[in-house]
């Protein structure tokens, strides 16, 4: 099986969208991605060249994470990672900061010039 997360080899500097799914791409009771909402995200990605980091609870469920990554890849949206969950309620901002810190440290250790220079979180919370 190929990796769902893509390398960042040709992206300098990086712009990232930390993406929630429920309430953003899935506003229904069926946990189904909505094409019109995916189209909005696709337009934003095309206009900015941003990559995606999944911060949604969908990252915790392998089948939902796979479904999301495949849907995004189908639209030429690159997923470069996912945040690590925290046990603390409402900790999503801290999870994002932890991802950025870890990502930058990893790139530095590998002597790679990749840094996320700009980012935003798209979340309904």
Predicted regions, residues:
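Short amphipathic alpha-helices and their capping/turn segments at secondary-structure boundaries
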Residues: 2-13, 43, 100-115
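Alpha-helical substrate-recognition element adjacent to the catalytic core
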Residues: 10-90
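C-terminal cap/substrate-recognition subdomain and adjoining C-terminal extension
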Residues: 66, 72-125
């Amino acid at each position: 099986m190929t990796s769902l997360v893509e390398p960042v080899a040709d992206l300098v500097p990086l712009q990232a969208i930390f993406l929630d799914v429920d309430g953003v791409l899935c506003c229904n009771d069926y946990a189904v991605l909505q094409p019109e909402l995916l189209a909005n995200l696709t337009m934003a990605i095309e206009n900015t060249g941003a990559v995606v980091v999944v911060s949604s609870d969908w990252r915790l469920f392998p089948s939902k994470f796979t479904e999301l990554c495949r849907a995004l890849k189908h639209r030429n949206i690159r997923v470069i990672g996912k945040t690590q969950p925290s046990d603390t309620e409402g900790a999503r901002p801290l999870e994002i900061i932890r991802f950025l810190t870890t990502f930058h440290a990893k790139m530095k250790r590998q002597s790679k010039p990749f840094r996320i220079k700009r980012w935003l979180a798209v979340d309904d919370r």
